[in-house]
């Protein structure tokens, strides 16, 4: 950064440096999204005793590129009676928060674009904005199917955001910070010797399960994909979209999946910390490799759920969120609060 500031001046150098860091995060993220689609098709293919994509390139590795080229070449058709400006704005409102949230995601304790103290609050605020893109997409298309899908999706996202928020309260109580780097550091000590036994997923196990399943519902993934239930409402709020406008919604969904996987890994699974004690030498050393492995395991759960569970009815989804997840999180928050101030506390106050 000092080199750029010496050439371009203080303000221009800082701006260029920030843009370079944004590009360094966004471009690999888009690549991960593309190949997550291939991984999904391969994993589900093997679970259904078939091969999956294997024609474009070796082992089908060029399939995401072929899909991107196909969508780029397709025309974006605007429905006759739609609100044209809002119709085109909706995909941007969906993908924007999904990418902007990565500004505060730490890959290691030193590798983070913006290490702000309220990073978790920033992510919660941004992810809640994604629902506006969904509602606008459903309304602007002037289709009863897209509007019904948008209403379902909005209600589902808002309902499960509450459960996710309450699950995060437990993490905030034991870590004492909204900073994601501090939350990971809090998991590096304890009676588990800094290993997998020190991470939050053990004492906060009910909150961990609620957060993971709520993340699946928040991203409208199976078995919570009633917003685009093909057998009921064609494709939900996607129904009027084509070409790159449809592809951007697709990118937003998978970018949100990766974001939920990263947050689950950071909040409950120790982030970049090794599952082995630090005394084990190189095996006990933390790093981005461990964060990537944990994210891959969480993403595999997303794909596994899609391949194995049937779709819930809409009323079942609402009942699960309001009558099961929210009471469970509230009860466990009380348990953790009492545990922290008891003689058996495993946390430093």
Swiss-Prot record:
Reaction catalyzed: a quinone + NADH + 5 H(+)(in) = a quinol + NAD(+) + 4 H(+)(out)
Annotated Gene Ontology cellular component terms: plasma membrane
Cell membrane recorded as keyword: yes
EC number(s) stated in the UniProt entry for this protein: 7.1.1.-
Transmembrane region(s): 14-34, 85-105, 120-140, 164-184, 196-216, 243-263, 285-305, 324-344
Domain of life: Bacteria
Membrane topology designation: Multi-pass membrane protein
Keyword vocabulary terms for this entry: Cell inner membrane, Cell membrane, Membrane, NAD, Quinone, Translocase, Transmembrane, Transmembrane helix, Ubiquinone
MF terms (GO), sorted A to Z: NADH dehydrogenase activity; oxidoreductase activity, acting on NAD(P)H, quinone or similar compound as acceptor; quinone binding
Gene Ontology biological-process entries: aerobic respiration
InterPro entries linked to this entry: NADH_UbQ_OxRdtase_su1/FPO (IPR001694), NADH_UbQ_OxRdtase_su1_CS (IPR018086)
Subcellular compartments: Cell inner membrane
One Pfam family named in its UniProt record: NADHdh
Keyword NAD: yes
Class of this enzyme: translocase
Subunit structure: NDH-1 is composed of 14 different subunits. Subunits NuoA, H, J, K, L, M, N constitute the membrane sector of the complex.
Record function comment: NDH-1 shuttles electrons from NADH, via FMN and iron-sulfur (Fe-S) centers, to quinones in the respiratory chain. The immediate electron acceptor for the enzyme in this species is believed to be ubiquinone. Couples the redox reaction to proton translocation (for every two electrons transferred, four hydrogen ions are translocated across the cytoplasmic membrane), and thus conserves the redox energy in a proton gradient. This subunit may bind ubiquinone.
Family the entry assigns: Belongs to the complex I subunit 1 family.
NCBIfam families: PRK06076.1-2, PRK06076.1-3
Protein name: NADH-quinone oxidoreductase subunit H
Organism: Chromobacterium violaceum (strain ATCC 12472 / DSM 30191 / JCM 1249 / CCUG 213 / NBRC 12614 / NCIMB 9131 / NCTC 9757 / MK)
């Amino acid at each position: 950064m000092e080199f750029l500031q010496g050439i371009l001046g203080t303000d221009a150098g800082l701006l260029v440096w920030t843009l370079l860091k944004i590009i360094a995060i966004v471009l690999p993220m888009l690549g991960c999204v593309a190949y997550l689609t291939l991984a999904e098709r391969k994993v589900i293919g093997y679970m259904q005793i078939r091969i999956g994509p294997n024609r474009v390139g070796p082992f089908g590795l060029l399939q995401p590129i072929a899909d991107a080229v196909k969508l780029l070449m397709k025309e974006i058709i605007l429905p006759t009676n739609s609100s044209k400006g809002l119709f085109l704005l909706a995909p941007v409102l969906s993908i924007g928060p999904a990418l902007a949230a990565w500004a505060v995601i730490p890959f290691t304790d030193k590798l983070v674009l913006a290490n702000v103290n309220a990073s978790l609050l920033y992510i919660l605020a941004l992810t809640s904005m994604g629902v506006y893109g969904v509602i606008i997409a459903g309304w602007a298309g002037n289709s009863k199917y897209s509007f019904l899908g948008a209403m379902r999706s909005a209600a589902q996202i808002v309902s499960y955001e509450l459960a996710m928020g309450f699950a995060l309260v437990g993490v905030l109580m034991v870590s004492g910070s909204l900073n994601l780097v501090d939350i990971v550091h809090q998991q590096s000590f304890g009676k588990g010797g800094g290993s997998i036994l020190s991470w939050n997923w053990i004492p906060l196990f009910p909150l961990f399960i609620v957060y993971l399943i709520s993340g699946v519902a928040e991203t409208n993934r199976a078995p919570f994909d009633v917003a685009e239930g093909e057998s009921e409402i064609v494709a939900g709020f996607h129904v009027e979209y084509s070409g790159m406008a449809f592809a951007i919604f697709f990118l937003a969904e998978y970018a949100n999946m990766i974001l939920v996987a990263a947050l689950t890994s950071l909040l409950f699974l120790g982030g970049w910390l090794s599952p082995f004690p630090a005394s084990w030498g190189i095996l006990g050393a933390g790093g981005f490799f461990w964060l990537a492995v944990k994210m891959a395991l969480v993403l595999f759960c997303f794909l596994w759920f899609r391949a194995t569970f049937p779709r819930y009815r809409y009323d079942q989804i609402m009942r699960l969120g309001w009558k099961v997840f929210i009471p469970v999180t509230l009860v466990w928050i009380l348990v953790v609060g009492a545990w922290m101030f008891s003689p058996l506390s495993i946390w430093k106050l």
